[in-house]
C-alpha cells in the first residue's frame, strides 16, 4: 500500500475537531510522575493518562494493550502481519513552571 500525503492531509482536515478534542482530553490530565502506588508504578496521574490514551485509541477502533501500567500500545492490524508502522510517544509531563 502506498501512502499518499494528500490522503493524510484529507484525514486530518476531516477529523480536525476530534483530534483537537482528544488532545484537550489528554492535556487535561496532570500526568506528572508521582509516588508509586499499587498498579500505578509512576503514580496515579500517569496511570490516568495511560488509561485515557488507550481509551481514545479504542474509540478509534484500535485494539489496545496495557502492560502493567508501565506502557501501553494500540494497533490496527494490516494485510501483512509481518510489516507494520510504529510510533513512540509519551503522555507524562514535567511539572508546571517557567520555560
Segments (PLM) and residue ranges:
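Acidic/His- and Gly-rich active-site-bordering loop/insert found
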Residues: 2-99
Amino acid at each position: 500500500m502506498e501512502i499518499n500525503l494528500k490522503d493524510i492531509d484529507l484525514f486530518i482536515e476531516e477529523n480536525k475537531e476530534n483530534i483537537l478534542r482528544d488532545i484537550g482530553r489528554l492535556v487535561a490530565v496532570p500526568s506528572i510522575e508521582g509516588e508509586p502506588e499499587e498498579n500505578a508504578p509512576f503514580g496515579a496521574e500517569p496511570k490516568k493518562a495511560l488509561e485515557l490514551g488507550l481509551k481514545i485509541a479504542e474509540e478509534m477502533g484500535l485494539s489496545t494493550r496495557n502492560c502493567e501500567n508501565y506502557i501501553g500500545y494500540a494497533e490496527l492490524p494490516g494485510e501483512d502481519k509481518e510489516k507494520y508502522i510504529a510510533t513512540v510517544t509519551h503522555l507524562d509531563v514535567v511539572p508546571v513552571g517557567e520555560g
